[in-house]
Amino acid sequence: IAEKNISVPDDVYTILGSFEPGSKFSISVIKSGQPETTSLSTSALPTQIPKELPLVPPLETAADNLAITGLIPVKLPEEPNECVALVPESYKTGVPHGLVVWLHPSGQFNQARLVKRWQRHCNARHLILLMPQAAKQKRWVPTEVDYVRKAIDEIRKSYRIDDTRIVVHGHQAGGVLAYMLAFSQRDLIRGVATVDAEVPQRLNVPANAPLQRLAVYAASDSESPRAARAAAALKRLRDLQYPVTTRQSKGYLSEMQVDELVRWIDTLDRL
């Protein structure tokens, strides 16, 4: 690509991230034993969500399942918080899995409901659902950003995580913490999806960086008293070149909207 050799897939993101939208470059491939070169141009990351996205089956050569699946406790000895991960039965160590970190609303953590909502998506789309809890169920505190980061690092030690599909997803107070985590952990988080949550006004939000790109999905109720402030904050993110996708929702997402959110997550690894 652009006369640079590709050794590993991550090289592609690094090379393409060095171009501004609208830049032209060449790509050379070997097709049926013959070299081919074509010209392409870059564009800004789209904010539309595909209505359909084909399931990609794992390669037949993917390693067999040697890891523990199901509901896995994730306990950090130095932290009082509880955490559990849902690892799909379809997990294979040779297949990178996206990671969805669910951050619950204040005082509302229902593990059974979460498993019911996400299990089929985890199996079909190669996702692991990480469910950390606030130390005090009634509310998250800003310092728990560090705890959630540790929990993410812990699950990455045991399972093969697709670094391009690490998403923090929160509702209400959990969504506020999701924004804090996403913008403070730019080296790690590639997507933030919130429902009925505002970007904290004092949060330091840097311009989007091509080599540490971050996509935003925000669902809200247009009749909410917070709607105007939330819209202004999202405009600021767009001005800073973040791809922002917005949806309307009263309360949490409907089942169809969760399906769409999963497709949004699945597009985060696009070039």
Where are these regions (language model features)?
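PDZ-domain C-terminal substructure recognizer with occasional recognition of PDZ-binding tails
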Residues: 10-52
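A domain-start/cap signature at the N-terminus of enzymes
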Residues: 43-97, 173, 180, 231-236, ...
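Gly/Ser-rich "nucleophile elbow"/oxyanion-hole loop immediately N-terminal to the catalytic nucleophile
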Residues: 89-96, 140-173
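Short substrate-entry loop that stabilizes the transition state in hydrolases
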Residues: 91-141
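Alpha/beta-hydrolase fold active-site loops
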Residues: 98, 127, 165, 213-215
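Cell-envelope and extracellular/periplasmic
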Residues: 104-108, 136, 156-159, 171, ...
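Primarily recognizes the serine-hydrolase "nucleophile elbow" in alpha/beta-hydrolase
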Residues: 164-212
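The feature captures the conserved acid-bearing segment of alpha/beta-hydrolase catalytic domains
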Residues: 191-269
